[in-house]
């Protein structure tokens, strides 16, 4: 069987298309750290946010995003609040998160940013810090 005279052209087109796909797949379209302070929270699809029967967000399936210092601040603020409450441990996580989420101006545990204005990654960081505070693991 004799190769078509268009075979080299077809091969070149396939290679060019493969190269473009690889370049597009490797392009950097991520956000910078400056974008982290956005005042608009991201929206997550249903099922990736855990909400208690009382309506408190207790889980956000996103990677927690905070610096070590921010984590410590959030954890310490949660711990101070928990120490002032009756009860201890895991039972205080949901009530604490309810306070954080209801605050019109944010609290120290959310870096003084309203819950609704935090990105899902920042909401996850607040929840991680609250869980650590309940277990006295702020560091």
Swiss-Prot record:
Lipidation sites (N-palmitoyl cysteine): 26
Instruction: Kindly list the places in or outside the cell where this protein is found, as annotated in its UniProt entry.
Output: Cell membrane
Superkingdom of this entry's organism?
Answer: Bacteria
What's the protein's topology in the membrane?
Lipid-anchor
GO CC annotations on file: plasma membrane
Q: What is its main location?
A: membrane
Quote the residue positions with lipidation, kind S-diacylglycerol cysteine.
Answer: 26
Keyword set includes Transcription: no
Signal peptide residues are: 1-25
State the UniProt keywords alphabetically: Cell membrane, Lipoprotein, Membrane, Palmitate, Signal
Q: What is this protein called?
A: Putative lipoprotein LpqV
Species source reads Mycobacterium bovis (strain ATCC BAA-935 / AF2122/97)
What is the phylogenetic placement of the source species in the record?
Bacteria, Bacillati, Actinomycetota, Actinomycetes, Mycobacteriales
């Amino acid at each position: 069987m004799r190769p078509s005279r268009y075979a080299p052209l077809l091969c070149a087109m396939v290679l060019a298309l493969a190269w473009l796909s690889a370049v597009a797949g490797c392009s950097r379209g991520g956000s910078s750290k400056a974008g982290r302070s956005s005042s608009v929270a991201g929206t997550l699809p249903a099922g990736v946010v855990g909400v208690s029967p009382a309506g408190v967000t207790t889980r956000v399936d996103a990677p927690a995003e905070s610096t070590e210092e921010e984590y410590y601040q959030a954890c310490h603020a949660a711990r101070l609040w928990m120490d002032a409450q009756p009860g201890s441990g895991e039972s205080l996580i949901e009530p604490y998160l309810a306070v954080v989420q209801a605050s019109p101006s944010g609290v120290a545990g959310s870096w003084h940013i309203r819950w609704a204005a935090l990105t899902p990654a920042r909401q996850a960081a607040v929840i991680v810090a609250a869980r650590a505070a309940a277990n006295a693991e702020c560091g």
